[in-house]
């Protein structure tokens, strides 16, 4: 049974749809650099948003094989390529970001991040996603733990 047609406002981000697997690396001031494996699923329901689920597992060091992060969220598609991201993260953060898509490049900057009482403090996030030669790449910068906006993650994912 075929699903509903893609909402026209989501056409500029249709390149994200599908199941993606890949590898990434991360680091942050005061944190030991690490490598990880990632799985991300992005789908639509016919409404003006894409839904996504993302999970990562560390591939090196003492935590090799352990899940280290997870996200569930929605990429809301607006007029003129404008976007809003609403995401909940397993470490205890909820993020609302806004930005845009141009060709196959998405840039999103946080409007606000809410931390659970037991979570570490994250004050800002910037995400950049782009598709290049069939590979979905991203960079994530954040301001956390009283640090200025600093690179945190980069990954390359392939559609499976």
Model segments located where?
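Sterically constrained small-residue positions within well-ordered secondary structures
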Residues: 31-33, 43, 66, 76, ...
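Secondary-structure transition/turn motif
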Residues: 55-57, 88-91, 111-115, 141-145
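Helix-adjacent hinge/juxtasegments
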Residues: 59-98
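Amphipathic/hydrophobic helical signal segments and adjacent flexible N-terminal regions
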Residues: 1-49, 57-67, 133, 141, ...
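Short acidic-glycine loop/turn motifs at beta-strand connectors
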Residues: 45-46, 78-80, 102-103
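Acidic, glycine-rich flexible loop segments
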Residues: 90-94, 100-126
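Hydrophobic/aromatic beta-strand elements that line small-molecule binding cavities or substrate pockets
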Residues: 37-43, 71-76, 96-100, 124-130, ...
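Short hydrophobic/aromatic-rich beta-strand segments that constitute the beta-sheet cores
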Residues: 22, 51-54, 83-87, 106-110, ...
């Amino acid at each position: 049974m075929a699903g509903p047609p893609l909402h026209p406002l989501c056409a500029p981000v249709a390149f994200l749809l599908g199941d993606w697997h890949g590898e990434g690396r991360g680091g942050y001031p005061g944190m030991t650099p690490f490598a990880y494996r990632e799985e991300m699923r992005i789908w639509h329901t016919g409404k003006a948003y894409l839904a996504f689920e993302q999970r990562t597992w560390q591939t090196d060091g003492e935590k090799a094989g352990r899940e280290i992060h997870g996200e569930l969220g929605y990429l809301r598609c607006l007029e003129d390529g404008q976007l809003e991201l609403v995401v909940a993260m397993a470490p205890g953060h909820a993020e609302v970001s806004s930005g845009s898509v141009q060709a196959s490049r998405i840039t999103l900057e946080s409007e606000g991040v809410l931390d659970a009482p037991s979570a570490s403090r994250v004050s800002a996030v910037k995400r950049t996603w782009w598709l290049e030669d069939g590979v979905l790449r991203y960079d994530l910068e954040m301001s956390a733990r009283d640090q200025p906006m600093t690179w945190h993650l980069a990954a390359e994912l392939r559609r499976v």
